[in-house]
């Protein structure tokens, strides 16, 4: 231990201390602070409390619920939709007696003809690479010819070597099932918490200030979720089908954050104290039940584990969990009597369906835009209720390249899809997404509360985003979702609030 605990005269440290040159004048001479004394700021007095509140209208799958926020505190900060999701089990009407339950067919079947996830469409994409004689070949020969055709396609399109069959466990093959589950099963779709919130709107004084959609909720978490703080269990996210099935068998409470502007930074918290004459409402539209579940066969019906009855739209329960901030009298009076403005971030959405591999979208966005976020979803994934799967053919990038035009002038030269999926998030976001989400940021730091760059699309007549998709996607229908995050100003006057700039 002597070698580890040997002493020192400290002369080396002193040598470093006096070794000063001309360049040190830029580093440490006339210092303005020290690392060896804590400097802090005093803050105003406050307290926080998280309060749950039921919706004012009925909650059900496929319905819109509305809530008027109670004036429990002076400010509103964090906000969650709390979903009480029932456990579900599968009952095969062809194999057992499912008392009091109608025949199946309500939910998509995983791996049937219409939902294989996109395997048939992938085969169509490589059809030009298949050797002659495929139709007359035996089933084994057909599989071999398909494999050879895929290898040619990979070499031609991606410069890739032959594909490998390297799935040897459940983690590598997420669709392999634990044998103990048997052949009859049902599960909630992945990330079901976020998917359930089809649309959430915040309404102040009868006017919608901002709207969030489930695709945006998923994309925003992928871009901003930080290590150790990913939502995973909060929203029902899993990585294998076995995990999804096992989780779905029990009742769960999910917490779905709503990333409105006032939840992102404390300085932008929504001041109820400034809204004596305006109410704040949250409207949440929930997804339809048949879009939320996947089953093992057409004859399967889904039962609520708590009641043993067929799952119904009104089996959904939800409330809103809101963090209220309480201020002392002086600061509360300041909010109540002062006229002021808050810089906020809104979200705009564009959606289109196409069967063309060359997509030209005219984006009718307004206001100074911080960034554009987009994704592509194949119809064959939608048929499987695989809603947040934005992958293309062979689980590759669906976007080959992208270009942006402002008034028919190129904003930047066409760049590969991977540049928008990897480099842009690396430069401007907290996280590089695990899936095929694409970003172009006009701001240096689009997650911050302070402006760091934008493009005022209200002053541009034509904004065109051109995407070159994989060639094979031109043979099927795909959905393209584009979201724009923009700045606006919320003005508070005489107990009322409204946007300074309308669309």
Listing of model-derived features with the role each one plays in the protein:
Residues 1-118, 128, 152, 166-503:
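Short, low-complexity Pro/Thr/Gly
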Residues 133-144:
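Charged, low-complexity interaction regions
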């Amino acid at each position: 231990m002597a070698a580890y605990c040997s002493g020192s005269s400290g002369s080396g440290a002193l040598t470093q201390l006096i070794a000063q040159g001309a360049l040190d004048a830029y580093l440490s001479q006339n210092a303005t602070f020290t690392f060896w004394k804590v400097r802090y700021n005093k803050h105003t007095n406050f307290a926080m409390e998280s309060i749950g509140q039921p919706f004012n209208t009925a909650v059900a799958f496929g319905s819109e619920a509305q809530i008027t926020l109670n004036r429990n505190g002076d400010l509103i900060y964090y906000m969650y939709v709390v979903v009480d999701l029932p456990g579900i089990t599968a009952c095969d009407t062809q194999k057992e007696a499912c008392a009091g339950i109608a025949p199946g067919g309500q939910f998509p079947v995983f791996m049937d003809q219409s939902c294989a996830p996109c395997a048939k469409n992938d085969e169509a994409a490589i059809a030009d690479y298949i050797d002659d004689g495929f139709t007359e070949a035996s089933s084994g020969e057909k599989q071999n010819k398909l494999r050879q055709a895929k290898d040619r396609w990979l070499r031609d399109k991606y410069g890739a070597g032959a594909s490998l069959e390297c799935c040897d466990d459940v983690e590598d093959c997420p669709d392999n099932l634990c044998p103990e589950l048997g052949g009859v099963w049902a599960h909630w779709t992945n990330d079901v918490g976020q998917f359930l919130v089809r649309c959430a709107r915040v309404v102040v004084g009868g006017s919608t200030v901002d709207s969030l959609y489930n695709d945006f909720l998923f994309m925003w978490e992928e871009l901003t979720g930080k290590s150790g703080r990913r939502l995973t269990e909060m929203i029902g996210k899993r990585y294998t089908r076995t995990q999804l099935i096992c989780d779905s068998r029990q009742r769960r409470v999910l917490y779905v954050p709503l990333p409105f502007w006032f939840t992102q930074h404390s300085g932008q918290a929504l001041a109820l104290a400034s809204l004596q004459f305006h109410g704040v409402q949250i409207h949440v539209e929930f997804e339809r039940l048949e879009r939320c579940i996947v089953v093992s066969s057409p004859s399967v019906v889904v039962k609520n584990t708590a009641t043993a009855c067929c799952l119904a739209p009104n089996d959904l329960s939800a409330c809103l969990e809101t963090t209220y901030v309480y201020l002392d009298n002086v600061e509360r009076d300041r909010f109540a009597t002062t006229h002021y403005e808050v810089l906020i971030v809104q979200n705009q959405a564009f959606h289109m369906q196409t069967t063309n591999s060359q997509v030209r979208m005219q984006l009718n966005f307004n206001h100074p835009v911080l960034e554009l976020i987009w994704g592509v979803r194949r119809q064959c994934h939608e048929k499987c209720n695989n809603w947040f799967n934005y992958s293309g053919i062979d689980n590759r990038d669906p976007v080959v390249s992208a270009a942006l035009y402002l008034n028919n002038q190129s904003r930047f030269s066409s760049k590969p899809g991977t540049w928008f999926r990897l480099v842009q998030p690396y430069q401007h976001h907290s996280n590089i997404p695990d899936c095929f989400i694409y970003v172009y940021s006009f701001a240096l730091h689009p997650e911050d509360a302070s402006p760091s760059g934008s493009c005022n699309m209200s002053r541009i007549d034509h904004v065109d985003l051109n995407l070159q998709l994989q060639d094979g996607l031109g043979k099927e229908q795909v959905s393209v979702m584009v979201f724009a995050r923009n700045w606006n100003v919320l003005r508070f006057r005489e107990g009322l609030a409204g946007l300074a700039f309308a669309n």
